[in-house]
């Protein structure tokens, strides 16, 4: 806490809610800052108790370690490179980031996974406010877009016959069932799928699917 007060470090996002409850203040007041890159919920669609939020999200810069399929001979070697990246590798990249967006969230970025293999990329990233990053840090500029956002709670998990699902498991349901039923198709503006984790152990969080209305 003393390092935080002295400006030597920032609090972990996963502890903010608990700290705010203990101190009986909002998270914004706790940080003494406005949440950066705010997004706007324009509609909520409920299916069997599961909420799917239609979100307008402004342009976002994501930075960290991004692996590009074009640098690999085949899909298997690309997938192996993703799997071989260790937690230490990811944290080493995160520690080099400049001007990280608050609050801090770990994000898995899936680029063009519904397209040809060579057009794909996969990243372990966080939001930042500048493209000027350290050597070895990859940056992806996510355009402003409409997204479908879904959380990994029990009601949503039960839609895919689970009590608790992982974020990535929601993408197929959203793409194959939710979108056709509610007048959406994949966005074609360069926006990408994101897994945004809200716990330190990456057990829960939000699936973001970039879409446009039909």
Residue ranges and their predicted role:
Residues 29, 35-214:
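A solvent-exposed interaction/effector surface
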Residues 6, 10-13, 18, 40:
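Extreme N-terminal leader/targeting regions
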Residues 1-10, 35:
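Recognition helix of helix-turn-helix/homeodomain-like DNA-binding domains
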Residues 14-29:
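DNA major-groove recognition helix of helix-turn-helix/homeodomain DNA-binding modules
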């Amino acid at each position: 806490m003393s390092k935080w007060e002295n400006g030597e470090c920032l609090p972990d996002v996963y502890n903010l809610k608990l700290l705010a409850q203990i101190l009986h203040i909002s998270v914004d007041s706790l940080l003494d800052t406005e949440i950066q890159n705010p997004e706007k919920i324009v509609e909520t669609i409920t299916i069997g108790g599961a909420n799917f939020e239609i979100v307008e999200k402004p342009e976002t810069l994501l930075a960290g370690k991004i692996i590009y399929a074009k640098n690999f001979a085949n899909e298997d070697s690309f997938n192996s490179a993703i799997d071989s990246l260790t937690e230490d590798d990811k944290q080493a990249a995160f520690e080099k980031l400049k001007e990280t967006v608050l609050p801090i969230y770990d994000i898995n970025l899936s680029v063009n996974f519904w397209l040809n293999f060579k057009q794909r990329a996969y990243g372990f990233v966080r939001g930042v406010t500048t493209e000027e990053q350290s050597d070895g840090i990859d940056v992806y500029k996510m355009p402003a877009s409409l997204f479908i956002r879904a959380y990994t709670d029990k009601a949503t998990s039960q839609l895919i016959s689970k009590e608790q699902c992982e974020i990535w498991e929601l993408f197929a349901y959203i793409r194959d069932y939710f979108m056709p039923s509610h007048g959406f198709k994949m966005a074609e503006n360069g926006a990408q799928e994101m897994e945004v984790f809200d716990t330190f152990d990456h057990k829960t969080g939000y699936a973001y699917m970039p879409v446009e209305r039909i």
